[in-house]
Amino acid sequence: MWHCTPRGTTEPSLPYFTSSCDTTLALKQKRPTDGANVAAKRRKVMESCDKGYSEAQEVPFTHILYNRKFCERFAPNHILNKINKVMSYAYPECEDGQTQEILLQQEMQAIKSPAFETTSPLGWQQVFTVLVAVLRRIIPNEVWGSSHNFCIMKRAVKKILMLGRHDKFYLGFLMKNIKTKDCRWATSLRSFSVITNLVAKVYLWIMTQIVFATLRGSFYITEHASCRNQLLYYRKCVWQKQHDYALSAMVNSGSLEKLSQEKAVTYSHLTAKKGSIPRIRFIPKMQNARPIVPLRKGGMPPSLLYQARIFLNELSKGCKKGSFKAKNAYELQNAWHMYTKKLMATKFTKPLYFVRADVQDAYGSILHSKLFELLKNCVDNLAPKLMLGQYALMLDTGKVSKKTVYILLDDKRQPTRSLVNGEERLVEIGSPIIVQPQKIFNAIKNLVSNQVITNGSLLLRVARGVPQGGTLSAALCEFYYASMCANHFSKYNIGTNMLLRAVDDFLFISQSRDEAKRVLEQTVCGVPDFNCHMNREKTFHNIDNQIVFRVPFCGVIVCLKSLQLLVHASGLANGYPRYSMRLNKFKAPGDFVKLRLQQVTLARLKPLVLDPSYTKCSGLIANVWRSGIMAGARLITLLHCVLSPRGPVNTKFVACMVIKVGYKVCRQVKSVFKRGNVNLTIPDEVILITYVGGVCTMMKWPSLPKWPSIHTNLKKFLKRMLVRVPSNMQMLLPTIPQTT
């Protein structure tokens, strides 16, 4: 541990650093010869610290370098007060008439863009201005050594402000272009490695103790419910108003109940950590804020918590008659496969009607008394002890799937349902789990009834709802609304009607207009005994307008005219694609970009959108093109954030990378059709041209940076591939966006 103290002073000029070098002198300064001059300079330093910031630049470098008192007294709030113009966060939009993909544009225009009003977050440009002013005020120019080094620091600060929630910033990014020879205060050290180590530690201290301290002290940094991983910066006074308003609204509505200090202590042993009470925080949404409580395990033993989650999931599966569960892609694929098969058997010709609804405040609307009543009725009808077997799906490769399937066992430890479903076969992977329903019910009741949170000195008890942040919150919410559908919506889920549910999102599809009207009336009225009310702004239908036949649900676009599921490419209108990925790779950037591009592409082309039982040739081409659209948007982000900062981009390498991913798309499509025992009639050249064409489309997208060299290289490849396309298949290429 070492530090440097100027002669004649008692305050350390440098903070403490951990150093691996053997040198004992960090900064070697010339010793003043005149004692009177030293005393005068010392008094000048102290006067400048007392007065503030006006005379700080006139103080010699040797006496104010990282003065601790000076740094502690600095407060950049006055800079914020001088900023009159507030920049709102803007989303990239696609201008009308600029592209020929009308289908995709219509889906994008149906998405409401977030609009922040008076409580808008600050733009990163404003925060950047504040931080640069702080660095100019505190750090003398001699520390940077040159304007080049200061520009590198500003570039690093800008990069930090634009990082995603889960991204990391490496010190190597900052030190890569720093000219250590310009830092004359460190040139007395002869070893280059020692100089670099010292400069790196100084720059690291500036980042942690000045830049990050200013961010923590002047801004509230949080994520947004609809902005994915992007960080938003609020003024603390503005965010405090939002926080107080959201908290008072929950107290006035009866969701939270105030407690005294003495009464709250009795609940502390049931919280996330023994003797501690979790603190509530809010995440901004379009209209209000979402409460988050880090309840986690809630004081329950891990083994009991594991059994409770499995038990609740099994209870939710028993409520199948109310709705088709579509929480993941596999469940939605099975439900849509059965429904399309039923419609094809009836030879339907009428148009389909749909009603989509969303529960307003799904987690906060759960009634504790109703939840306990539902659980009690289920527990009373079960045996004191249950055995659940652990199984997994056997894949075509001979390996076992990582996802565990739990099946109820009888007294002879035999599964209560078949382990073979068509070509799917389940194999046992572990010993049975013994579950005691009554014990789990008591634990859940204690957990839900005794939820206590804190907000500063205010202590509150959750009187209604389950907090988002608990381990069992999602399972309790799923069971609650599955029971509601079984009690109130089972009459609609018959015949050619289908009610899909993904936790709190509902989609009703029917051939009958009267049935659709009945469901719409039910959603408007809500379900009072479950305290369930639908969000009218998110409720839409095509009862009065049959032209609308596409509806987004559970991450896909449901086309009711062609009965196909399309890739949800219109999600690009929600925000900048950069914040949908984690960019934490420091080494091998080319391989990292290739891996991310492949992951983005294949994640969109799941068996859900490629199932040959309901996917036609036009739908397959549309999904491949849409996956190319999504991959192209993220490729631009990867080029801008990963490859461009390291120097000139090899565009031929990037074009070859896109083509290689296109060949993997062909193999993915073939694999899905092979598992469905269906011959693929579309040649590989058509699929490859479609995917690469989608990527080329994003290279000329109006609202994104353009890469003409990559676009040119890909077009050359497309021209060579077009010659190989059979004449009877060329008709698919000009109509890529069409789905009917």
Tell what function each PLM region has.
Residues K385, V519-E521, G526, F530-H533, ...:
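Catalytic lobes of large eukaryotic enzymes
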Residues K274-P278, K350-V355, V462-R464, Q468, ...:
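Core residues of folded domains in eukaryotic genome-function proteins
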